[in-house]
Amino acid sequence: MREDVERWEAKYRAADPDPELRTNPLLSGHLADLYSVGSALDLASGSCHSAVFLAQQGYDVLAVDCSATGLAIGRRLAQREQTTIRTLTADLDEMTLDKEAYDLVVCFRYLNRALFSRMKTALKPDGLLFLKTFNVHHLASSPKFNPAYVLQSGELSQSFNGMVMIDLNDGEDPKITQSWIVARCWQ
């Protein structure tokens, strides 16, 4: 894990320290599905663009990432956008998530299959999950990408079976290099 942290720290040290807010199209495309208030968890938040966007929508957001530098960029972004987020530097391999603690859990461009069950149990009843990351088709254009970090076709629907699917692209189309799921928890 230490090697991963150092790699991400280097990435964010080299990044623009004051980026413009970039809203993830999956989130902005599902505004009608979001509650206007509630608690949100942004996993592998990086420089916190999704966290800041969700805070602007009225959520109390906790942004979690292994990179303290990325989270510092995110706090500055939140301040510039005149909103507030909470941040936590943590190893997502080791982090436990409280049961039924969040109305919304989001995770973009990060794949940790061990988190899947923790993300589901962290959702409150009727809570919403957003997950989007690279799938196996990404390897055609990026053959050096680690194949352990891509989703297989059908993996999301199988992993999140039992949730109410709102939007799902599960890697069937070889021209689409990311898979995503938007699903509601009903317990």
PLM regions with names:
Residues 1-35, 38-46:
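Conserved class I S-adenosyl-L-methionine
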Residues 74-75:
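Conserved SAM-binding loop
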Residues 97-104:
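A short acidic, Gly/Pro-enriched loop at the edge of an enzyme's catalytic core
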Residues 171-187:
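Core SAM-dependent methyltransferase catalytic element
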Residues 67-69:
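Conserved SAM/SAH-binding beta-strand->alpha-helix loop
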Residues 127-134:
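Conserved beta-strand signature within the Rossmann-like core of class I S-adenosyl-L-methionine
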Residues 81-92:
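Conserved SAM-binding strand-loop segment of SAM-dependent methyltransferases
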